[in-house]
Amino acid sequence: MSMSQSALIKEEISSVSFQFYTSDDVRKLSVKQIVEIESFDMLGGPVPGGLHDPALGPTGPAERCATCSLDFIECPGHFGHIELAIPCYNPVSFQTIFKLLKNKCFHCHHFKHGKPIINQFIEELTLLFKGDVVKARNLRERNVLLRGYEEKKKGKSNEEGEEVMESDESDSDKMDTDENKTNGKIICDGVFNAKEIYSGKATHIEDFKREVFKEFFGSFSGYAIPCGNCGAYSPRLRNGDASKSKLFIMPLHDKYATKNSAIKLPTNFSSVKEQTEHGTWFAPWEVLDNMKKLFENEKEILDMLLGHLVPIVTNKGGAKKNVGRQFTKESNVDSLFMRVFPVTPARYRPPNFVNGRRSEHPQNSHYKGMVKSNKMIRQSIDAGEGKAKFLVNSVCDLQMHVNNMYDNSKSNSNTNEVANGIKQILEKKEGLFRKHMMGKRVNYAARTVISPDISLETNEMGVPQYFAKTLTFPQPVTSFNYNQLAQAVINGPEQYPGANFIEDENGHLINLSKESQEKRIALSKTLLTSHPHAPRGVNKKVYRHLLSGDYVLANRQPTLHKPGIMGHRVKVLGKNEKTLRMHYSNCSTYNADFDGDEMNIHFPQSLLASAEIREICANNYQYLVPRNGAPLRGLIQDHILTGVLLTKRDTLFTKADFQAILYASCWSVNTKHPIVTPPPCILKPVPLWSGKQLISAALNQLTIGRAPLNLEAPSKIPTKMWGTKGLEITRDSHVIIRQNEMVAGILDKGHFGASSYGLVHTCYELYDPDVAGSLLTLLGRMFTNYLQSRGFTCGVDDLLMKNKEEKFRVETLKKANEEGYTVAAKFADLSKYDEQKARDFFSKALQSEREVARLDGLLKKGLNQYTSKVIDTLIPGGQQKPFPKNNFSLMTVSGAKGSVVNFSQVSCLLGQQELEGKRVPRMVSGKTLPSFQAYDASARAGGFVMDRFLTGVRPQDYFFHCMAGREGLIDTAVKTSRSGYLQRCLIKHLEGLSVQYDNTVRESDGSVIQFNYGEDSLEIGKTPYLTKFPIIAENYELFKSQFPMEQLIEQLKNQEVVEYNRSIKTQPELDPVMSKFNPSSDLGCVSESFMNQLNHYIESNPQKLIKTTSNRDGKINEKDFRNLMYLYYSRSMVSPGESVGLLCAQSIGEPSTQMTLNTFHLAGRGEANVTLGIPRLRELIMTATTKPITPLMEFQINDSTNKVETEKMAKYLEILKLSDIIKDITVQEYFQDTNRNYDIEIEFIPTLQQVLSLHRIKEKQLNKLFGEFNKVIKRQVKSQGKLKVNNGDIGLGSKVRGSDLVEDDSLTINDDDAPANDDTTNNDENTSQQQPSSQNKKSKSKVITQDDDSVAAKSKNKKKQNVNYEDGEEEAEEKDSDEGESEAEESDDKSDVDSDSDEISNSRSSNSFSDESIEFDQKKLTFTISVASDSKKVLMLGIVETEASKFVLKSCKGITRCFVNEKQVGGKTHYSIQSEGVNLSEIFELRDKLKIDEIYTNDIYAILQKYGVEACRQAVTSEISNVFAAYGISVDKRHLILLGDYMTFEGGYRALNRIGIENNTSPFQKMSFETTFSFLSKASLMGDYDTVTSPSSRIVLGQIVKNGTGSFTIVAPVK
């Protein structure tokens, strides 16, 4: 091994540019042309000129290279090449060629844009490449206006069929000269220096560049656009077979051929004289000729668009000289085509041996295909004209093989045997990028099962000796460690502690396992002697075994957040141990348990890495979780229980026991000082020590030489558990520690578990992390020792209840079962429950999901009261054994294990079983299980389990319970992958965000995302105690001892800040102090909220500790306290280099694994669905959707306490369908003459007039709507029977929404809202002028769809409704396909909506029906439909019911239903309206009736469109926060603010997916995310480059990431 790990690196890659190899490049690279199809001859030797020619390098260990004469290990391999018989398209750039051809003129071979417009684009791009994005954008805005003017002018002259007027020509000339002038000013000479190139890589520039490219290639690619230079019309091109990259040139349309011949220009642009209507094959060599001419004529703009960076070399005095770091952009037509194909070295295509027979590498098939096609083409060319068709096929075959080499997915072959292309090798998880270049596998790592060990310290890791002998560290030999390392060399690899290798000064390794004892002794003596030819200043190194005291990284997968990898101090275990050992307190950090989990350890190989692990990464420093700053480490289960038992009042010890426990816990702490036993707390009859004294003694031992601790904090166990008599302080529920003496309270999970503001957390903050770690170790040992003598168990008597409470339980549960019948009667509108009537009602009503949900809601609400009543009465008051004697109760209350839910399931009842948030579903028969009756209304039949585990669960109830359990298991399995991908998207986008030395948060390209991290520059882990002023004031001396206070104040004091803070008090309108000064260097420059809280504390002075004018007895001077808090703020600031982007991604990704997957949750009063959990996070973050699954708004009317008016407004905004006002439908069928007649009678609900007045629909409009409905029915009958309907014509009118026919002005809807549910009208009068009927129907048949179940439930039909699910889906599909509706149609809609109903009735009169056809009064509507008697019979009732459930009488676009919610504010009930669907424009129209400044909506895109990007940013933050809050998960707002800032940084709403990463400036980062091949192709085509600043790109190139400790370099002083 000649290369040493410590070899000095003299150069590193600072940037990488991407481009294609040209034919000349490939020829220079190649050592051999491949011409033979066969690779091996009959004897198995390589064929010269074949794919395994010896010149390409050896393929096996026994061979030597014919080119460089090196063996298999040393030879890197050499490229070959295949000369293609004809030029082929580069598969990557085929689409670009197609775009260029569409934009070029086939007559003058320029772009069709014309010179002035081309110059505009050149100007914009030059400014952009210089990095001046502001000037470029301003120029672009001006140019876009100019371009619009030019196009209009052109369009006019073309329409009139006239030549362009002379004046216009002179205008354009003048403009051209103007452009050239500015051109000269801006463009200079197309030379860019390295600084400009770096500054040209920014997110906004990438975004702008994409805009320009899109416009350039999109604006003139149309077929009917004449050339801006010569006025010629060019033919249309057709893109043929994708696998063979074929192009066809279509004949010129007669109209344009005439125009061309009029100005004496050609009309046939193909080499073939007779063209078919399908077009002529456009041969690649013809395309190449065309492209060459284009690249010659349009060099300047093409260099900008497709050029790659080329260093400028001058040729002074005959010698080539590189000019500084200057570059120019050059494009090359050769990069779009392939004349030569490179062949990879033979070592990368080794033959496979199966059963002794050699088979070639799959990739060879692509090369062979090319060689074969080459030969065919040459033969066809030699044969002449007769083989033309044969030639075309061979050319296509050659192109296909070239394409397959790049990407085999486009192959025509149906078999899966096509070898992988380059795309398949690079992409996906197993591809080159993600599996290899991003770094996955490492050396010096070990993995085995983990097991707990209580005698280890919390920061230690027990490592088996087997691992310790294999993992080594390269220790440089010095005079200080010579003896130790010499002994290690003598011991050798087998005897521990020994060494495995010695590395000499030249980097050569000596393997000690092959050396004898004598040789090892001899080698040990030469460790300090240096070789005469060795480089100076280099020591020998001994690869010694892993020793106790070394630091390793430990990791458990999945590593969801930063503490998933932590540093541990090694404790090497005995010979026979086989598992890794660790302390219990690390379990919650790694999310580990000991049921077979495995973990990895990594041994760092440099002293620098070891130092970072010890000082930054060590697990004592990972006490707080970055997600919200809460503690993560703590003692668990048995320890928590023992903590309660040890510190409660009646626990007393003799001197021997006390000292035994105290020594067992403190033997390793401050070992230079004796352990002091305090005086006993009880002297007579015998001296006894309490458990609280053990804690006091341990604290005294731990804090020797430091100020003692003062603490007051509540315990987790509630006060009521200790009884209700006496003072609260006598009930041990509040811990009080004074000067290290524990005087009251008990220690439980709240103090040494993973809980905030407890004893351990306070020690972590007031002393240091190592003290907190030692305290956890000490308490763990203490509790274990006590538990060994005390013991703990749990018996059946812990679970029993008193007789009185048992009776209460039985009676309450009887009532609960009857509650099912009560609710059912109420639901069915019966005065009392009648089984038959209820069953009939339920059999119809429960067909609708909406009604099932309503019944579930009512029953759950009723039954929950009974469940709560039973549990509250029985626990803890009804237990036979009271707390704390009751061990089961002790477990659940102290937080050791289990909860009240577990206790209640054992002793009270199991309660309501739910599946996906609903009660147990019914089968088709109406039963929940075969053992219950159909539509049984009892609570038990619906899954309410009244049994408990103590006395047994009946089979039916057990089955329900198992159903609910199974759902949880499936949920866990499914959500893992969903949340995993979500976290990956977050990580790849946010990885480059870090804090800089000016306190800003920047992307790796230097773009500023935030000016202060989280708006206050504070680190989340340092903020928990920042505003806990009482604790800091009580421990003032202890806290003060952490800082060299006077010295720091002197350094950081700034009088200007003091003055500014004073003036803010009197002038609150001034800017915050943080916007004027630097918080990291100016004392007192703190956030507004911190300043306000500090001022409030000092003014109120609750503990009277601060010395003020009103309180002279205080201990602490106000000025000193203020300065201390300012220093604390400075110390709590986020460190420069912190990877806040990664922390944000982990803090959102990690808790998402705890969410359940169930999508819907009932919001508000329990009727409107909202998406929650991972699906909601995905639509907010990953897709940044413009149409959320469940959009909703919430708003109030001006008088929000008025329930009646609120309900009226809710009704007014709701959609009203015909089925909502129908009571009954009857159809009579009879024959008359030669017709079959259907008399249809629709009976309306009695409250029709009230409904119509609420929705503001007039009778005149209703008549019109019924006429429309009649037409809809006829059209349905016609389509079902495919027959002619006799009564009058059927108009082409489609489904109609009522808002088209309602005259109320307030329902004028603007179309600038997100088109969530776009409904459009169809005017029958206009059908003759519109497109053919089929197209018309397609483009104008959008109806607000709603799940049909709800419609069925709301209509009061006596007949069973025929709900058709497929219809809903089809409509949804149709809606999607119609998204690109033209603006003209939209403006039509507006005029339709706004028009007066009288005009509508006039406009429709030409096609309306006579009064005999429809009869309508207040109670019913009748009409007749006639069809020919020989026609197929149709189910008329079904048609009418289905169409009535779809026919919209009135709607407010986007809003389907509204609910009224109520909440109590200041003793008053306030009502708000919650709508399903969002339409902000409509709400704005009603601003005189609604509180317009108090609208809430969860549709972020609608907020962006209406309120702008700042509101959008706030909405993103609050919506994500709401998703987590629903699951009780807290994520610090700083993470959410950062994510909101990142997503809205570009001024829009950016998705965290592959579309959102498009504007990222690092091609490597994009490639390592997704669609590697696509991003690589784009980078090569555009001549992109990577400045190697993003973490991904640095990892790809094997460099240290520039975040954290990599964000600076350490320079040694040179003396």
Swiss-Prot record:
<keyword id="KW-0804">Transcription</keyword>
<feature type="binding site">
    <location>
        <position position="595"/>
    </location>
    <ligand>
        <name>Mg(2+)</name>
    </ligand>
</feature>
<feature type="compositionally biased region" description="Basic and acidic residues">
    <location>
        <begin position="172"/>
        <end position="181"/>
    </location>
</feature>
<feature type="compositionally biased region" description="Acidic residues">
    <location>
        <begin position="160"/>
        <end position="171"/>
    </location>
</feature>
<dbReference type="GO" id="GO:0005736">
    <property type="term" value="C:RNA polymerase I complex"/>
</dbReference>
<feature type="binding site">
    <location>
        <position position="65"/>
    </location>
    <ligand>
        <name>Zn(2+)</name>
    </ligand>
</feature>
<dbReference type="Pfam" id="PF05000">
    <property type="entry name" value="RNA_pol_Rpb1_4"/>
</dbReference>
<feature type="compositionally biased region" description="Low complexity">
    <location>
        <begin position="1400"/>
        <end position="1411"/>
    </location>
</feature>
<dbReference type="InterPro" id="IPR007066">
    <property type="entry name" value="RNA_pol_Rpb1_3"/>
</dbReference>
<dbReference type="GO" id="GO:0003677">
    <property type="term" value="F:DNA binding"/>
</dbReference>
<keyword id="KW-0240">DNA-directed RNA polymerase</keyword>
<dbReference type="InterPro" id="IPR045867">
    <property type="entry name" value="DNA-dir_RpoC_beta_prime"/>
</dbReference>
<keyword id="KW-0808">Transferase</keyword>
<feature type="compositionally biased region" description="Acidic residues">
    <location>
        <begin position="1305"/>
        <end position="1316"/>
    </location>
</feature>
<protein>
    <recommendedName>
        <fullName>DNA-directed RNA polymerase I subunit rpa1</fullName>
        <ecNumber>2.7.7.6</ecNumber>
    </recommendedName>
</protein>
<feature type="compositionally biased region" description="Low complexity">
    <location>
        <begin position="1317"/>
        <end position="1336"/>
    </location>
</feature>
<dbReference type="InterPro" id="IPR006592">
    <property type="entry name" value="RNA_pol_N"/>
</dbReference>
<keyword id="KW-0479">Metal-binding</keyword>
<dbReference type="InterPro" id="IPR042102">
    <property type="entry name" value="RNA_pol_Rpb1_3_sf"/>
</dbReference>
<dbReference type="Pfam" id="PF00623">
    <property type="entry name" value="RNA_pol_Rpb1_2"/>
</dbReference>
<dbReference type="InterPro" id="IPR007083">
    <property type="entry name" value="RNA_pol_Rpb1_4"/>
</dbReference>
<feature type="region of interest" description="Disordered">
    <location>
        <begin position="1305"/>
        <end position="1411"/>
    </location>
</feature>
<dbReference type="Pfam" id="PF04997">
    <property type="entry name" value="RNA_pol_Rpb1_1"/>
</dbReference>
<dbReference type="InterPro" id="IPR007080">
    <property type="entry name" value="RNA_pol_Rpb1_1"/>
</dbReference>
<feature type="region of interest" description="Disordered">
    <location>
        <begin position="155"/>
        <end position="181"/>
    </location>
</feature>
<feature type="binding site">
    <location>
        <position position="597"/>
    </location>
    <ligand>
        <name>Mg(2+)</name>
    </ligand>
</feature>
<dbReference type="InterPro" id="IPR015699">
    <property type="entry name" value="DNA-dir_RNA_pol1_lsu_N"/>
</dbReference>
<dbReference type="GO" id="GO:0003899">
    <property type="term" value="F:DNA-directed RNA polymerase activity"/>
</dbReference>
<keyword id="KW-0862">Zinc</keyword>
<dbReference type="GO" id="GO:0006360">
    <property type="term" value="P:transcription by RNA polymerase I"/>
</dbReference>
<feature type="region of interest" description="Bridging helix">
    <location>
        <begin position="955"/>
        <end position="967"/>
    </location>
</feature>
<keyword id="KW-0460">Magnesium</keyword>
<dbReference type="Pfam" id="PF04983">
    <property type="entry name" value="RNA_pol_Rpb1_3"/>
</dbReference>
<comment type="function">
    <text>DNA-dependent RNA polymerase catalyzes the transcription of DNA into RNA using the four ribonucleoside triphosphates as substrates. Largest and catalytic core component of RNA polymerase I which synthesizes ribosomal RNA precursors. Forms the polymerase active center together with the second largest subunit. A single stranded DNA template strand of the promoter is positioned within the central active site cleft of Pol I.</text>
</comment>
<feature type="binding site">
    <location>
        <position position="593"/>
    </location>
    <ligand>
        <name>Mg(2+)</name>
    </ligand>
</feature>
<dbReference type="InterPro" id="IPR047107">
    <property type="entry name" value="DNA-dir_RNA_pol1_lsu_C"/>
</dbReference>
<dbReference type="GO" id="GO:0046872">
    <property type="term" value="F:metal ion binding"/>
</dbReference>
<dbReference type="InterPro" id="IPR038120">
    <property type="entry name" value="Rpb1_funnel_sf"/>
</dbReference>
<feature type="binding site">
    <location>
        <position position="75"/>
    </location>
    <ligand>
        <name>Zn(2+)</name>
    </ligand>
</feature>
<dbReference type="InterPro" id="IPR007081">
    <property type="entry name" value="RNA_pol_Rpb1_5"/>
</dbReference>
<comment type="similarity">
    <text>Belongs to the RNA polymerase beta' chain family.</text>
</comment>
<feature type="compositionally biased region" description="Acidic residues">
    <location>
        <begin position="1366"/>
        <end position="1399"/>
    </location>
</feature>
